[in-house]
Every structure is written in structure tokens, then in C-alpha cells.
Amino acid sequence: MAPTKRKGECPGAAPKKPKEPVQVPKLLIKGGVEVLEVKTGVDAITEVECFLNPEMGDPDENLRGFSLKLSAENDFSSDSPERKMLPCYSTARIPLPNLNEDLTCGNLLMWEAVTVQTEVIGITSMLNLHAGSQKVHEHGGGKPIQGSNFHFFAVGGEPLEMQGVLMNYRSKYPDGTITPKNPTAQSQVMNTDHKAYLDKNNAYPVECWVPDPSRNENARYFGTFTGGENVPPVLHVTNTATTVLLDEQGVGPLCKADSLYVSAADICGLFTNSSGTQQWRGLARYFKIRLRKRSVKNPYPISFLLSDLINRRTQRVDGQPMYGMESQVEEVRVFDGTERLPGDPDMIRYIDKQGQLQTKML
């Protein structure tokens, strides 16, 4: 029987070349928000990491992330919650570097949000069952945080557009909050008059506003709500989940005026005190957003830019109405060219919507 041939390379054979390393994005610079001021190339990718703190009410300096103790009214007409009982949306604007020095070009560069990695920070803090919570058993630990919970975040190139919906249109909300104006019974279902932009942090109560599904073409939002009295919070921790922000055309939110907007609301449930009172508990949210530069058609012709510049320099006057439903303008006349003197000064001549000359006798 012939000897078995040894596996492996023959003596004197040239060694195999090692495989080329995988290509990954080259890190140009890393730091704080001041890094955004560094000019980069057209193909550069920028990553922004930030976090939003919860706005639950914070009744005192020791209860950051908690609301004021809740109290329910006996009927709809007497409902008047206090300001610090109301969890509100958190929002922020992140300024991005200016990409265009010449706004008269046919094409411009805009920042485009491509992906986001996000998670709720501090979920293990809810394992604390020994700090002032109501006991489940006489000699046991405290009651864990439970009840209705809501987790929401949004990333966009402009402020999130909101739709107002109320549980009780007769509720009287306190000063310092922004709620739907002039509510009616229709406000408890769908009233298209209740529109707003999420343009202020800690001002829009979560119970009054939801993202508007008919708008927000330039934003992406995600949220879950779980209702119930004894529902436990279910949250995940991972740095491997990435949410793609591109639409079906492969385009992500375009950051208008070089501004990126992030919003969040993370209500984990109700904390039950030893006295039996309850408070909302909220946590912060972390964002890691990847942006790239996209070439777009210039939507602002030079005539628009000049007109806008001139209009901004015009002095504004808060005067009586001269346009709209209550306009005090009686008549406008337009003269063009000359004609022979008419014999009837009361004859009305005008051009209709079709551009035809019309004559009307009084």
C-alpha cells in the first residue's frame, strides 16, 4: 500500500498571501459637539450621539424622573391636573455644519439622516424594590413599577408634527403646558383643527398629543403603548439593533437649515409609594444617528432669496386687519395704459378670471 500523501504545502512553495482586511469607514475625528464645526469631504459620514432626559414633572430636586403624586377626580367636569402631574415630550435641536456657501447653485448639499441606534437608559434601576415602595408582603420587597407604559422616539429634519386628541375635552390644563385650543367633544376623537409642531421641550403633555400620521414626511417616529393596571415594563438592551430611516424611495429625513431634531417620551409605568400614592416613572433615551451628505435640487431660486431678504428688512406693524375674512380693504383699482375718455363714468369694466374684458352698467 502506497504511503499516504502528507497534506499541506510542499517544501519550497511560495507562502500564500494573507486576505485583505475588510474595508470599514475611516475615522477622521472624534470628540464633542465642537467636532461638527470641522469641514469634511462630500463622501464623509457623520455620527452624532446624544441623549434626551425624561420630562415627567420632577416635583422636587430629589425626584428627577418622577411625576407629582397622581390624584383622580370623581367626574369629568372637575378634572384639573397640576402641571407636575403631566409627563411631557422631550425634544431638542442639534445644529449641523453649514454645507453650502453659495445658495444660488442649481444643486445643494443637505444632511440626510440614514440610521439610528437607540435604547432606554437605566432600566435596571427599576430592580430597586427597597426604596420607599409599597410592600407586597409584610416582610418582603416593595411593589415593582407597573401599569400603563409608553415608549416613543422620533428623528427628523424638522420639528415633529402633532395631532391633538383628548380623553376629556372638559379638562382644564395648567399654565406652562401647550394643549389643543378651544376643545370640543369632537376633540375626544379626531379634530383636524388641533395641529401643532413639537417645538418646545417639556411643554406638550403626552396625554394630549400624538404624532400626526398624515404629515411628518420629513421625520420618522416609532412608538409602543401597553395599557393596564398590572402590566410590567418590557424593555431590551442591545447595541446591535439599527433602525433604518430611509423611505421606499431610499431617502431619509433631510435636515432643513442644517438642523437635526430628536424627540422622545419613555414612561415606564407607575411607582407605588408606601402610602399607596402613585407617580409616573420615566427614563432617558440614548441616540446614535448616522448622517450623510445628499445632493438635492435647489428649491430656492435667487428671486425668492432676494425677496425674502427684502421682506425681512421691512418693518413689521401689528395693525388692523387688511387681509383675510375681516379685511378692511374696500376696493383695489389697477390701471394699465391709456384710453379715450369714456362718456359714462359709472360704467364698470374689469377682467374676469378667464382674462376676458367685461363691461357692466350700474
Curated annotation (Swiss-Prot):
Keywords: Capsid protein, Caveolin-mediated endocytosis of virus by host, Disulfide bond, Host nucleus, Host-virus interaction, Late protein, Phosphoprotein, T=7 icosahedral capsid protein, Viral attachment to host cell, Viral penetration into host cytoplasm, Virion, Virus endocytosis by host, Virus entry into host cell. Its main location: virion. This is Major capsid protein VP1. It comes from BK polyomavirus. GO terms for biological process: caveolin-mediated endocytosis of virus by host cell; virion attachment to host cell. Homomultimer; disulfide-linked. The virus capsid is composed of 72 icosahedral units, each one composed of five disulfide-linked copies of VP1. Interacts with minor capsid proteins VP2 and VP3. It is found in: Virion; Host nucleus. InterPro entries: Capsid_VP1_Polyomavir (IPR000662), dsDNA_vir_gr_I_capsid (IPR011222), Polyomavir_VP1_sf (IPR036931).
